Amino acid sequence: GNGGDADGCEGKPAGDQRAEAAALFKATPDTSRKILLDERGSEWASRHMAEKLARWRDDGVPALTFWIGGADGASQSLKDQADEKLAFGRQTWPHRLVRVMISEQIYRAVTILSGNPYHRD
């Protein structure tokens, strides 16, 4: 037997979450500001995100790391270690789409800070 329940999945999500968290911790510089993308996080307007980026820049934060949970969500250890938790609404989004969404929001925030007309209120 596989030691799991009838469908062989007992403990799999938690194990996957632990492995994903370990890989993210290993890849994240200690000095980085860690932002977890999580449906239970705070929702930031684009200008609010720009203000946060400016504050972190002015405070000398050397790097930002955006963590995206896997298919089963983020582990509790990621939630505990995150400096901020950001939500793109309460919906669940595909991992690859979230990568594009956060990239666009970072770009948008930078254009807001530089006075570029890309963002319109």
Identify the role of each PLM range.
Residues 41, 72-74:
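Conserved nucleotide-binding/hydrolysis micro-motifs of P-loop NTPases
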Residues 2-65:
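S-adenosyl-L-methionine/SAH cofactor-binding core of RNA-modifying enzymes
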